[in-house]
């Protein structure tokens, strides 16, 4: 396994994202937990604040194809594909590629990209309905750390099982007390937020062989509101 940012081409805000204890409250987290319209297309403090396709994933598709040697003959799975934006762009790049997605949100599936809606399956992230070693690449962005520790372990084991060894996951993490505090202020769905060294132990436990990247306060450019 290696630490590697397969999302390096994804646009990041240049200005800090200011967070604090009274911006995203328990009411916002309750709303987000339903993963319905409020989370995807409602108020920004409840989730995305409008989750619309804008083509920003196209650059990610190109870089991932180079990073992982993906071609039209590859098989790809995205765990937690939401509205299928990344899958859609892969489908446009390689129309004959075997593409599959899983999602737990009925709203996201109902409002997913028409081009890939037929290949999105509703299922738990801990029980993927696929054969062993079925996919050349398995992707899970913003998924694993929204689960309990037990389910995060099960999800990683499933990613390892259905893939052929190549995968990419993001993990909610911190390196110090400040980072932990800022990430807690920011996250709506984060359930397992660990120190980077603790995540390494989890990955070793499941025999993970793919790539991982830490979603942290530094990565997100979070800053604390003062005064």
Language-model features and meaning:
Residues 1-68, 75-129, 147-154, 158, ...:
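Class I (Rossmann-like) S-adenosyl-L-methionine-dependent methyltransferase catalytic domain
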Residues 139:
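A conserved beta-strand element that flanks and buttresses the S-adenosyl-L-methionine
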Residues 142-146:
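Short catalytic micro-motifs in class I SAM-dependent methyltransferases
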């Amino acid at each position: 396994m290696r630490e590697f940012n397969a999302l390096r081409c994804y646009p990041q805000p240049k200005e800090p994202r200011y967070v604090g204890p009274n911006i995203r409250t328990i009411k916002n987290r309750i709303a987000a937990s339903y993963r319905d319209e409020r989370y995807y297309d409602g108020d920004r403090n409840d989730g995305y604040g409008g989750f619309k396709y804008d083509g920003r994933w196209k650059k990610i598709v190109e870089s991932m194809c180079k990073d992982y040697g993906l071609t039209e003959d590859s098989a790809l799975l995205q765990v937690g594909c939401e509205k299928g934006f990344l899958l859609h762009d892969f489908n446009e790049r390689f129309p004959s590629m075997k593409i599959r997605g899983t999602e737990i949100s009925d709203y996201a599936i109902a409002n997913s990209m028409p081009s890939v809606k037929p290949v999105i399956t509703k299922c738990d992230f801990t029980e993927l309905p696929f054969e062993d070693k079925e996919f050349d690449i398995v992707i899970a962005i913003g998924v694993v750390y929204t689960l309990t520790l037990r389910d995060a372990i099960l999800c990683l084991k499933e990613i390892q099982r259905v893939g052929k060894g190549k995968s990419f996951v993001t993990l909610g993490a911190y390196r110090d007390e400040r980072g932990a505090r800022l990430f807690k202020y920011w996250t709506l769905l984060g359930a397992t937020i660990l120190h980077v060294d603790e995540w390494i132990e989890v990955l070793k436990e499941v025999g993970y062989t793919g790539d991982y990247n830490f979603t942290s306060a530094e990565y997100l450019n979070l800053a604390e509101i003062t005064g």
